[in-house]
Amino acid sequence: GLPTQTVQYTGTDVDDLNQFLQNNTGKIVQLTQDIQVYKNTNGSFGIIMVPSDTILDGNGHRLVMKAGYTEAPDVGVVLYVYKDGVIPSTNCGVKNLSTDIPYVNSINVFSADNILIENNTLNNATKSGIMISDEYGSTVNGIIRGNTINNVGDDAIAVYGNHSNLLIDSNRISGAKGFAGIAISCLQNGQQIRVDNETTGPHDIIVTGNVVSGCSGEALYCIGSYKTYITYNTLRDSILEGVCLDSGCIGNYFAHNEVVNNGIAGGLPG
């Protein structure tokens, strides 16, 4: 299961934090001050890599750009250690962390089992605040809860691929400019495919208690998903529909949601 023992990291440097995380696998690593990040020439430096059996607890602190650097790393936090090459990651997560840095994705999950992404504030990503992608396989058994995501260039929470047993709960999203505030999609690596040829897709996902507002696409968009349970969400003020269950959606459940002042056009924006 997830780790329970806490150890504090007292530094500020992102590369030093990565080494500390690897030295303290099996623990909750709690920050005591903001972390300074930057993009090195090889591209991987500046990305926080959380190993398996480890949680990064921001403890209310932030990721900020290091003085003298202007280019952000591609990603803020990944639940993966590049040099280990172990997929899927297991029993890991990130919580209580904030950033306004314009990453491509603020938090990226490639393939993982039993993850926690909780109480983070993620603003200004050029793509997604939280991206669960399928380049290396599926993610199962995850909690995405209590995050605040604003002003992203694509989907605020993106679940792309054959992922399952996820709880997307009590997140607050505004100003997403992509498909939707929350997108649950069988599109492989974000690419358009023929949904009627697909035999896999995101499934057994609960979307509950979220507030999604002011999006350029739909508030909630599903394509090729099955057994998605959508309850007690507030979906409002989006340019397109409040909710779109698009091609290939089977056996989804939608009840007790408040859908207010959205557009009537549907499908993909643009």
Residue locations for each model-derived region?
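Extracellular beta-strand-rich solenoid/capping regions of secreted or surface-exposed proteins
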Residues: 22-24, 36-55, 64-95, 101-113, ...
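Intrinsically disordered, low-complexity Ser/Thr- and acidic-rich flexible linkers and loops
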Residues: 85-86, 135-137, 186-201, 265-268
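Short glycine/acidic-rich loop motifs that flank beta-strands on beta-rich extracellular proteins
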Residues: 39-45, 65-71, 102-109, 126-132, ...
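Solenoid scaffold repeats with emphasis on beta-solenoid/beta-helix
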Residues: 29, 35, 48, 54-56, ...
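Acidic Gly/Asp/Thr-rich repetitive segments characteristic of extracellular carbohydrate-active
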Residues: 1-32, 37
